[in-house]
């Protein structure tokens, strides 16, 4: 495992990317939105210590029930993954990443809705929301004009917003295992 970590460090160095991977590999989990704990309950990572130049932040497979985006001062963040946690709602502070975020992965949580602020992420190209409890998507979703990939599989969606037809760059829409009766018309 140490060799793999070294390889990731070398890859990040070679490509100029800075990745902070806070996914537990030892059974650890997050107990609150501010730090992650190791398997013994000790603090393993304090999010305020995350390098401000980080472009990728991976917080998958923890037990986060909430996540306050204002605690992160990451203006260069391109990829944020919070998959496989216990998030029930998304903090509207997500809009603070509007100038940089291109990939947002939130699958396998307990999200019931998304704040309208999600639609302010104008550079977003990939949005994964599968395996949640979403009953609807924001009406303004069509404002994500750069969106290429949208996954909303395994939710409770009865309809997709009509503005979805405005996503002219959308290459992949995956909406399997929902309660859909019709698709919005293309515009």
Language-model-derived ranges and their functions:
Residues 1-131, 135-139, 148-153, 159-162, ...:
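The feature captures the LRR N-terminal capping module
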């Amino acid at each position: 495992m140490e060799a793999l970590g070294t390889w990731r460090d070398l890859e990040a160095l070679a490509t100029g990317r800075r990745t902070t991977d806070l996914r537990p590999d030892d059974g650890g989990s997050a107990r609150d939105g501010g730090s992650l704990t190791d398997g013994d309950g000790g603090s393993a990572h304090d999010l305020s210590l995350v390098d401000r130049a980080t472009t990728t932040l991976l917080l998958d497979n923890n037990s986060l029930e909430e996540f306050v985006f204002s605690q992160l001062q990451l203006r260069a963040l391109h990829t944020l993954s919070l998959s496989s946690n216990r998030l029930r709602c998304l903090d509207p502070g997500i809009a603070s990443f509007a100038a940089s975020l291109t990939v947002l992965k939130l699958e396998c949580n307990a999200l019931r809705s998304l704040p309208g602020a999600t639609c302010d992420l104008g550079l977003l190209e990939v949005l994964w929301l599968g395996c949640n409890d979403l009953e609807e998507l924001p009406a303004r979703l069509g404002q994500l004009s750069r969106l290429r990939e949208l996954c909303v599989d395994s939710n409770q969606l009865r309809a997709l917003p009509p503005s979805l037809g405005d996503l002219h760059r959308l290459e992949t829409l995956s909406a399997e295992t929902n309660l859909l009766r019709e698709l919005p018309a293309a515009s």
